[in-house]
Amino acid sequence: MKQLTIQDIQKLGHRLATIRHSMDEDLDAIKALYAGLEPRIDARITAISKLHGTFGMSHLCLMFLHKDLLNRSWWVTNIKQRASESDIQSLACSFSSYSRMAFIQSTFSSVESSFRLLLRELDSSACNGGTSDFKSIYECLLKSKLSQYPTDSVDLLDLLRLVRNSVHNNGVYFYRTGQDDAVTWKGHIYNFKHGFPIDFVNWDFCITVADNIRMLMRNVVEDSNIRAIDRLIIDPFS
């Protein structure tokens, strides 16, 4: 297990803070674009705000690691017991892993719920009323329902989907047919070997994927076909 350092966590926190700032700008822009609609309900706005919340919570987790969990003084003041350096490292690594998996799950859930809602509004008959498996949903939405296909978007979501599915098995990839899989995204091949742990899902990877998800989501909700829907798209998950 790689030792966590305050410097490493601080760098990750700065990266995520920069993305949060971009997310602030995204949310303001989408609220302005759909100014006549209720921002807490309309699915085009909540598509951004749900991700905004996820990124914010994950940034807080990194700040907690940086400011508190990796500092012995916090343990003395709050836990009221002596903790060895190895104990602090072990618990901090466990918290980091837990927070990273929550980041993946929440990002995936936000995208999935938003894409299903948007597809139903664009075509209520597509993908069994938006209830088919998620790969069918995002391929249909991105490839055939928008005015322009967002470059590399299906590869990005294939990658996120397979990573998220591996989270269900504590980071080990399994598929019902026993087959391996691979995704090529931005020129890099990510391999998923059946029955083996995936070894590339660190914080840097998660933050990079999340930032690209952020850009994709804004691209989708700004698409002219989505903008042409002149009624409220109710998000029951908001």
Stretches with model-predicted labels:
Residues 1-105, 151-158, 162, 178-238:
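Extended intrinsically disordered or low-complexity regions, especially N/C-terminal cytosolic tails and loops
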Residues 115-162, 169-170, 175:
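Short non-catalytic regulatory patches outside canonical folded cores
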Residues 110, 164-167:
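Conserved short aromatic-hydrophobic micro-motifs
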Residues 68-83, 101-140:
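Short, contiguous, well-structured surface segments enriched in hydrophobic/aromatic residues
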